Amino acid sequence: MSAIYNFCAGPAMLPAAVMKKAQQELLDWNGQGVSVMEISHRSKEFIALTEQAESDLRELMQIPANYHVLFMHGGGRGQFSAVVNNFLGEQGKALYLVSGQWSSAALAEAQKLAGEAQIDSLNIVEKHNGLNAVVLPDLHKIDADYRYVHYCPNETVDGIEIFDELDSPWPIVADLSSTIMSREIDVSRYGLIYAGAQKNIGPSGLSIVIVRDDMLKLPSLPQSSIMDYRLAVEHDSMFNTPPTFAWYLAAEVFAWLKSTGGISSIAKINQQKAQMLYQCIDGNAFYRNGVVAANRSQMNVTFQLVNEALDSEFLKQAQIAGLVALKGHRIVGGMRASLYNAMPLDGIVALVKFMNEFAAKHS
């Protein structure tokens, strides 16, 4: 069977080595004679798995000791509400930086739960010569007392990424769903990091939360117990039955990433993949991208065919060539190639070859 390269934005492809190992262990995990999906989450064997998973993630991301690592339900959208309910209290205010679809969704959820009076926002994307560009504000010049400032460093729908570290006088809450472990960051700069698993960690249904200890002292609002960070810390992420199979696969992805050289190594590969694809787009008048070079996403490359009438044919022929899930988000249209950690360099080579051949044929 010819290679299939899955460019889906999420749920995204998983490393082939992880998938093969899961396949081999599906009916008999760790010599138990049953699947990992069938054992108690409180068994010593599964507890050992969770401890190793946290240890590997801490090592990969160099997470300081004063941070808790939580494996929770709900995905990224679940955390939109959890952040508000855990940190805002009845009187607190927060600032949301809006750079695209996902930060807008987080803002809308915060305003729904807390009311617009408690939630301020700033649009940080401007047009520069017709292209989207991020302009980070000087937050130190804002006269306000916020519990936290929220932002999304990578917008998967819009193809926008913020590479500069945010400088804030208030705790930073970041949605890293699409960039976690794709490049190195300084975790100590953040009050809380959250990430839906289905892009760079594992299957959907799991979210990772990395929260600094002092954040748990902020006033909270009444909320569901399963989204209460304090209860999650107290119960080692097992206040209720966790998504065990997703946790198992996340553990395998962490181990795989360590075996490939860690985040510093995969970051170089990710940069190379993105550069190859953007060079193809920029070097061919057949395609265009709407983001300034400094803010082009490494994880989610969005592009359009100049002749949009060829979109359907492009997708059809790409599918035949084994290049799947290239259709852009319904809100923005066009094309999108998601280049998460599991996407091999060969996938980009194949995509670039196809794009060049398609352009030559239809120009």
Curated annotation (Swiss-Prot):
Record has Cytoplasm as a keyword: yes
Grouped into one coarse class, the protein's main location is cytoplasm
Q: Which InterPro entries match?
A: Aminotrans_V_dom, Aminotrans_V_PyrdxlP_BS, Pser_aminoTfrase, PyrdxlP-dep_Trfase, PyrdxlP-dep_Trfase_major, PyrdxlP-dep_Trfase_small
Which residues are noted in the entry as pyridoxal 5'-phosphate-binding? G76, R77, W102, T156, D175, Q198, N240, T241
Q: Which GO terms describe its molecular function?
A: O-phospho-L-serine:2-oxoglutarate aminotransferase activity; pyridoxal phosphate binding
Q: What's the record's note on cofactor binding?
A: Binds 1 pyridoxal phosphate per subunit.
GO cellular component annotations of the record = cytoplasm
**Residue positions of the PTM N6-(pyridoxal phosphate)lysine?**
K199
* Reactions performed catalytically: O-phospho-L-serine + 2-oxoglutarate = 3-phosphooxypyruvate + L-glutamate; 4-(phosphooxy)-L-threonine + 2-oxoglutarate = (R)-3-hydroxy-2-oxo-4-phosphooxybutanoate + L-glutamate
Q: In which pathway does it act?
A: Amino-acid biosynthesis; L-serine biosynthesis; L-serine from 3-phospho-D-glycerate: step 2/3; Cofactor biosynthesis; pyridoxine 5'-phosphate biosynthesis; pyridoxine 5'-phosphate from D-erythrose 4-phosphate: step 3/5
Please give the SUPFAM superfamilies that the UniProt record associates with this protein: PLP-dependent transferases
Localization of this protein: Cytoplasm
* Binding-site residues, L-glutamate: R42
Under Enzyme Commission nomenclature, its number is: 2.6.1.52
Q: What cofactor requirement does the entry state? A: pyridoxal 5'-phosphate
Tell me, what is an example of a GO biological process annotation in this record?
L-serine biosynthetic process
Which UniProt keyword terms apply here?
Answer: Amino-acid biosynthesis, Aminotransferase, Cytoplasm, Pyridoxal phosphate, Pyridoxine biosynthesis, Serine biosynthesis, Transferase
Family stated for the protein in its record? Belongs to the class-V pyridoxal-phosphate-dependent aminotransferase family. SerC subfamily.
Subunit record text: Homodimer.
- Primary role: Catalyzes the reversible conversion of 3-phosphohydroxypyruvate to phosphoserine and of 3-hydroxy-2-oxo-4-phosphonooxybutanoate to phosphohydroxythreonine.
Listed name of the protein: Phosphoserine aminotransferase
Source species: Shewanella baltica (strain OS155 / ATCC BAA-1091)
Task: Tell me the organism's taxonomic lineage.
Answer: Bacteria, Pseudomonadati, Pseudomonadota, Gammaproteobacteria, Alteromonadales
